[in-house]
Amino acid sequence: MNPRDEAKIKFFSDTLRSRLGDNLCQLILFGSRARGDWHEGSDYDFVVILRRKKPEMIDQVRDTEVDFLNRYDELSASLVYDEREWERRRHLPIGVNIEREGIRL
């Protein structure tokens, strides 16, 4: 991963952690940015796993995506789950791919 991408991912991670605090269990980068096969215009895909998933927590994730867009003029997209939801979904095809290719932040 190049240093520019690392800085962008760190911004997203740090911003999200400051907003969600202990409610954030895991943050995983997945997709082309994690695999290293991205191209110009590729977005940054994240899985956000929360202890408790409440509307205000989802709003904090969306606010972080907007801040990312405003700062870097690039898109990020987040799948937001609570721990139980992730436990069920990680066995589905997308979850298997995320577990295999994702980078835990």
Please identify what each model-predicted range represents.
Residues 1-26, 35-40, 50-105:
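Catalytic core of pol beta-like nucleotidyltransferases
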Residues 32:
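Conserved H-loop
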Residues 45-48:
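Short beta-strand->loop micro-motif that forms the acidic, two-metal-ion catalytic signature
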